[in-house]
Amino acid sequence: MKHFLRMLIQVCLYFYCKFLWRCLKFVMRKLTGRCELQRICYNTKPGASRTMKIETSLRDSKSKLLQTSVSVHPDAIEKTIEDIMELKKINPDVNPQLGISLQACLLQIVGYRNLIADVEKLRREPYDSDNPQHEEMLLKLWKFLKPNTPLESRISKQWCEIGFQGDDPKTDFRGMGLLGLYNLQYFAERDATAAQQVLSDSLHPKCSKFSKAEWEKKRMDKAIGYSFAIVGINITDLAYNLLVSGALKTHFYNIAPEAPTLSHFQQTFCYLMHEFHKFWIEEDPMDIMEFNRVREKFRKRIIKQLQNPDMALCPHFAASEGLINM
């Protein structure tokens, strides 16, 4: 009974607050002569702050046109803006900047949704050793990470040298599908020097090679190693969940002036790999069993950063050269 009453109170509060909000919007329109979309565009700077407010306003609108505008095809955005202006009785000749601002916001909103679909498609596609394209990508990954060491055979224990668990990497891609391979190859190719350095650092000796006394004295270079490829796939999972949950909207809306693309997502992965590697060293774990603890602490730190509407995960490395700040 208590649970039912609590739920009833929450529902009542929701509708009460919604009613008050609609009343406030009505009053503001009468006082300013502007609709909510106009007030947001004129009073909020470009970037995540503006786009997220526009997205909320469109999604929560009573109008079906506004509700569906966040999921239209990119080619229909311009026509959708015209329909919104007509619905709101806004003269585009008197308010020329409004249409431009709304279009920029919708490009980001629709682009983010499409990016999720593109990333999800890669995640759901399993690695197929009979697919020449998949095999070529995998062999390129080795070449980029170990340019001076030939791979003796496709099935080889050498794969463990770059952090796979066995002699055939395809089994390690089951969780993230092709997305994990795409990200690893992107990092290894676009930021080869850094990727090779991170790989080298990940091969640090384990603490078992030292006595307890020696380990306590060795403060500067004692970081526990980790499996580079496996961690890369794990960080891919982190990036994927940040994307799907909407946490990355802040970042993408601040760095992509139009629609965020797969390249933006891969650049974000590179940034997360860099930052996780530094964070791992800072945390100074005693053994690899602490990976989940370190990873969760890192996830919370990234999410906290992304809660700042002005936040952009600004990477400073080769793979980020294509980023355009707003």
Swiss-Prot record:
Residue intervals of the ELMO domain: 133-306
Listed GO MF terms: GTPase activator activity
UniProt keyword terms in alphabetical order: GTPase activation
Superkingdom field: Eukaryota
Entry keyword annotation includes DNA-binding: no
The keyword Lyase appears for this protein: no
Purpose: Acts as a GTPase-activating protein (GAP) toward guanine nucleotide exchange factors like ARL2, ARL3, ARF1 and ARF6, but not for GTPases outside the Arf family.
Protein name: ELMO domain-containing protein 1
Classification lineage: Eukaryota, Metazoa, Chordata, Craniata, Vertebrata
